[in-house]
Amino acid sequence: MDRYQALFAQLEKKNQGAFVPFVTIGDPNPELSYDIMETLIEAGADALELGIPFSDPLADGPTIQGANIRALDSKTTPAICFELITKIRSKYPDTPIGLLVYANLVFANGIDNFYTKCQQAGVDSVLIADVPTNESQEFRESAIEHGIHPIFIAPPSASPETLETVAKLGGGYTYLLSRAGVTGAETKAGMPVAQLLERLNQYDAPPAILGFGISEPAQVEEAVKAGAAGAISGSATVKLIEQHQANPEALLKALADFTSSMKAATQK
């Protein structure tokens, strides 16, 4: 049983959904970034979704673009990111760790090389934001060869065919979008999700975690009630880093409080 399967089985026993925060590694700097990841897990995060800083994050709204800029300004490289993941992995052997990256980053030193690094660091899954299922073959094959789950996005506008492909090709979990567009807490999550979930279940998709625009406990509760296996919160988590970056102590406390309130909302 891999880490995601073990997590979902465990949560099912407790009658809970998963709460998964997203942060960009190296935001606001590599040292504090490690403390942030540690704080998120200690405060109740069931898994982590991590970004490797990239200079042109297309699918991200201004909040996460800001995180990328801060991380790059603090000289965070992919090598530093993998070091930090390795460190977190050795402290938390069972917590699933997913990466959310862009194709250029995977291509940079060769696809196999990228997935080898993921495997060595203890990464469980990789979602490549700008690679749709029909262009995913070489990434997917390399991921699977290295024991990494390829994650695919199920958008709200998806046709039954797309959902079936996402269900068939994905592993670990399915990233279910609560709305189309760029990420951000500003636009409230619109939730036509029950229908999408029903479809994905028909096609035997990996458990669906709802992302995009999830910024408060009520939305987590709603996602879990609708039948999602959990919720991912990116912009709202990153916004706290942006607000408190000058005061590490206040920053870690704000993240811990936010995480524990979001996690509490996953109880069915």
Curated annotation (Swiss-Prot):
PROSITE patterns: TRP_SYNTHASE_ALPHA (PS00167)
Nucleotidyltransferase is among the record's keywords: no
Active-site annotation: E49 (proton acceptor), D60 (proton acceptor)
Protein name: Tryptophan synthase alpha chain
Pfam families the record matches: Trp_syntA (PF00290)
Protein source organism: Aliivibrio fischeri (strain ATCC 700601 / ES114)
UniProt enzyme class: lyase
Gene3D superfamilies: Aldolase class I
Keyword check for Lyase: yes
InterPro entries reported for this sequence: Aldolase_TIM, RibuloseP-bd_barrel, Trp_synthase_alpha_AS, Trp_synthase_suA
Record's function text: The alpha subunit is responsible for the aldol cleavage of indoleglycerol phosphate to indole and glyceraldehyde 3-phosphate.
Annotated catalysed reactions: (1S,2R)-1-C-(indol-3-yl)glycerol 3-phosphate + L-serine = D-glyceraldehyde 3-phosphate + L-tryptophan + H2O
SUPFAM superfamilies xrefs: Ribulose-phoshate binding barrel (SSF51366)
Pathway(s) where this gene product acts: Amino-acid biosynthesis; L-tryptophan biosynthesis; L-tryptophan from chorismate: step 5/5
Record-stated family: Belongs to the TrpA family.
EC number: 4.2.1.20
GO cellular component term of the entry, any: cytosol
